[in-house]
């Protein structure tokens, strides 16, 4: 794995910020895009732009074929049984809202329950919360310990309470904890409960096999895996997608329409109302191909070394406290320093060329659990280097001295 060759594919990294080389460590928020992705979307608008599924002319057919080929590529990437199990969405958030809305229309009744975990991003909390509150139901929450590890004994106890659906993060966007999703899916299925996996933080860093996990649904965003913004995916087992009613209504998702009734299209089209983001879907396919052409195991090992190096070096800072210390972690490190506000630290190291995320990371209940207002989060990608980790740690050390 040649880091320099990889970095050369990401022109945004080759710049200075405030006179310092850019160190981009905000990859959990969004990854940068390789030239092949940028060029593919550009080429679509230059040479192929057309609405799909609706025309007999050359451009429409060409764009339709490209779009559906992208769907099949994504299906193969996550080992779905076929392209009909892949619904293109705007991202993880829309995918989860789609599921919450469709589940509600299908079988949520007064007093029902939904099960999530204590480490969820707001996108995997608020849609379920709002849905269940409309029916005077209960949101059950799997607790975690001080290291950011879920209590699976309590999880099983909560499963016995009969939630209608379980929705859990594969990897926490704050803690970096890798949850035992395969085990959790098996446990839920023993009680006949469907499981949704939020894969926003895992899709870029780990090889995903939805059939091996056996989840009923898996959702992710393209922009967190080197693809354009505005495109994401909802994978669902076909038998579940067949049952669920449409989320939105309009063009393309219908079969027949009259003033008296409407029938809906087949999978996956009944969930894709209106004109889709074709260019971004083609960019997503290109990002998938980009990842598949790499040694994924070598990438995982490289990112793990970056994380361990960062943790080891940061540990020497007086007063540092890591938020999330699970043995199985991936991709990121969150921390606070005694007497230093995360926003102040983030602002100062930005002036040193280092981009990190500060705040509650759209996970306020996690901050409440640890009794803090927010954290500094550094998140890594394949194009980051050990030198960048060292620059980041040195910047944090300097900022901490300035702020105390």
What label would you give each PLM region?
Residues 1-404:
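Pyridoxal 5′-phosphate
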């Amino acid at each position: 794995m040649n880091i320099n060759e990889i970095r050369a594919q990401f022109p945004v990294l080759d710049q200075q910020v405030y006179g310092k080389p850019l160190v981009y460590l905000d990859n959990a928020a969004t990854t940068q895009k390789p030239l092949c992705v940028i060029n593919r979307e550009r080429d679509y608008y230059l040479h192929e732009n057309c609405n799909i599924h609706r025309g007999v002319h050359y451009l429409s057919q060409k764009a339709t074929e490209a779009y559906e080929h992208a769907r099949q590529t994504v299906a193969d990437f996550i080992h779905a049984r076929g392209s009909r199990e892949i619904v293109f969405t705007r991202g993880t958030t829309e995918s989860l809202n789609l599921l919450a809305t469709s589940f509600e229309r299908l079988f949520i009744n007064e007093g029902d329950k939904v099960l999530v975990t204590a480490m969820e991003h707001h996108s995997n909390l608020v849609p379920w919360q709002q849905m269940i509150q409309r029916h005077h139901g209960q949101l059950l929450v799997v607790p975690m310990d001080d290291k950011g590890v879920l209590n699976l004994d309590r999880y099983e106890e909560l499963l016995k309470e009969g939630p209608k659906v379980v929705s859990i993060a594969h990897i926490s966007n704050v803690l970096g904890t890798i949850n035992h999703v395969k085990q959790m899916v098996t446990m839920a299925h023993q009680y006949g409960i469907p499981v949704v996996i939020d894969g926003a933080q895992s899709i870029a860093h780990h090889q995903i096999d939805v059939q091996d996990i056996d989840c009923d649904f898996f959702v992710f965003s393209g922009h967190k895996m080197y693809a354009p913004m505005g495109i994401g995916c909802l994978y669902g087992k076909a038998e579940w997608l067949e049952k669920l009613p449409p989320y939105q209504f309009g063009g393309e998702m219908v079969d027949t329409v009259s003033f008296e009734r409407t029938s809906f299209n087949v999978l996956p089209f009944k969930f894709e109302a209106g004109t889709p983001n074709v260019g971004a879907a083609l960019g997503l396919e290109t990002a998938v191909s980009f990842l598949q052409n790499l040694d994924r195991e070598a990438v995982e090992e490289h990112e793990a070394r970056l994380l361990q190096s960062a943790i080891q070096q940061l540990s020497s800072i007086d007063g540092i406290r890591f938020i999330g210390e699970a043995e199985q972690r991936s991709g990121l490190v969150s921390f606070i320093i005694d007497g230093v506000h995360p926003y102040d630290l983030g602002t100062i190291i930005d002036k040193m060329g280092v981009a990190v995320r500060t705040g509650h990371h759209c996970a306020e209940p996690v901050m409440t659990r640890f009794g803090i207002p927010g954290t500094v989060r550094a998140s890594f990608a394949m194009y980051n280097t050990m030198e960048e980790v060292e620059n980041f740690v040195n910047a944090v050390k300097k900022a901490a001295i300035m702020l105390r």
